[in-house]
Amino acid sequence: MPPPALPADIATVVSRAIAEDLRDGDLTAELIGRYTPAVARVVAREPATLCGRAWFDETFRQLDHRVSVSWHAADGDAIAADAIVCELRGPARSILTGERTALNFLQMLSGTATATRSLVDIVVGTHTRILDTRKTLPGLRLAQKYAVLCGGGDNHRIGLFDAILIKENHIVAVGSVTAAVAAARRQSPNVMIEVEVESLDELREALATDADRIMLDDFSLADMRGGVDLRNAHTGKRQSLEASGSVNAASLRAIAETGVDYVSIGAITKHVRAIDFSMRFA
């Protein structure tokens, strides 16, 4: 498993989350003595793929270094309902102040990882890989991209800066698939270039370009199979094929069995269902 995002990014998003919750202080936690010690346990209330340890830890590092966290599972691990995920020891005030912020990160990122894992499991036995998209929660892209990796998926481009994805409006503005890919290669010779196509005719045109990957946008299953056949018969540069658009769990297996290399699914980061975790004092 790669390291979770960038340490600076983790510190920044956690700091913002604490600030929006805490502001001038935790009025309720002040009811408890300043030096009252506590032991707390975080329990999963449903099966999940765990993700978010670094953000959870950073919350308490910023609030109070005296709070220690002992983990019983790693990011990417499958956890069962009622499993104890971690144990905290330290001042009760600080644990209570950080509880909601820390759990928010753990619940959201585990939700993304769990959703990804459920889709990855559907395509087991095929060579198709599941990709995320840029449809992420604002300010949390690197965190969610990491969660996708924890769930067994792959990252598409991180942003507009690290790869070129030529879509329909770009093609219309430039004039053609061929012209758009050629312009992209001249501009960025060492960057991955992907081009979106909406028909088999556009796919034929794209196969003759220097694109690295071709996105099949809203293709029917029959056209996907035809597209894979066209790619496999092509004697030039071998481009990977990515299916995109209107993909869900019910349609995913059939799409993977057409032979496409990737399926990109925005819902895994856009439609996040948080995993239910609770924290209880021992």
Task: Locate the predicted segments by residue.
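Acidic/glycine-rich phosphate/pyrophosphate-binding loops and surrounding catalytic core
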Residues: 1-209, 213, 225-230, 240-242, ...
